[in-house]
Amino acid sequence: MDTAQKQRWAITLSYDGSRFYGWQKQAGGVPTVQAALETALARIAGESVATTVAGRTDTGVHAAAQVVHFDITAARPQQAWVRGVNAHLPEGIAVLHARQVAPGFHARFDAYGRHYRYLLESAPVRSPLLKNRAGWTHLKLDIEPMRRAAALLIGEQDFSSFRAAGCQAKSPVKTIYRTDLTQSAGLIRLDLHGNAFLHHMVRNIMGALVYVGSGRLSVEGFAALIQERSRLKAPPTFMPDGLYLTGVDYPGAYGIVRPQIPEWL
């Protein structure tokens, strides 16, 4: 059917990444977020639906506010794309908001900012209640040098030292607008706001910050690591469990509002 007859919708969804093998559809019926979402959307639309996501997430990585767009010919009310779709989604995924958008809107290319949070438990024994919800280290961490190191990430830089080997990004140069590191009740929260992120970038940053907090890497060493622009001397990639995509920024004209981070997170 002529694409001119189609409507473009944008939805914001949340999901528990520990239940899925990442965002992207895979062969062999492997459970992924995209496969589950497109199946549920098709049930409501009465036609096959292809989705485009703001940012793909790996196995075990969560989303508090992921954004997706899709095109459909079927006319459905807004609540059909929220309550209706949720009725057909498996546990671990929920559509939070839906909005019809301009035909030219693109969930990935129109995004000018992305927000991530890494939740880290620092304790001698890992809490079973936080498994799959937070990363963990048995090491006692000093948060002050970690804060100073994280602040060095701000600005436009070449982040090759925090880039996965298989990263498909055209350039390792990204801009970090803000970093924030807090600690309460044994949990450390790292918040990063940037224009875009490389594959495994946040997890690699957290791995290096854990080295800083434990004294295995100085703040000066962290600065040198950034300048090395190489993974060869960098600490290992940290576990995915504590990583959350918490928001995506779009121009106000699209009307897509970034929800607040849940209080429990």
From Swiss-Prot:
Its EC number is 5.4.99.12. Substrate binds at Y116. Keywords: Isomerase, tRNA processing. It catalyses: uridine(38/39/40) in tRNA = pseudouridine(38/39/40) in tRNA. InterPro entries: PsdUridine_synth_cat_dom_sf (IPR020103), PsdUridine_synth_TruA (IPR001406), PsdUridine_synth_TruA_a/b_dom (IPR020097), PsdUridine_synth_TruA_C (IPR020095), TruA/RsuA/RluB/E/F_N (IPR020094). One of its GO terms (biological process) is tRNA pseudouridine synthesis. Homodimer. HAMAP family: TruA. Formation of pseudouridine at positions 38, 39 and 40 in the anticodon stem and loop of transfer RNAs. This is tRNA pseudouridine synthase A. It comes from Neisseria gonorrhoeae (strain NCCP11945).
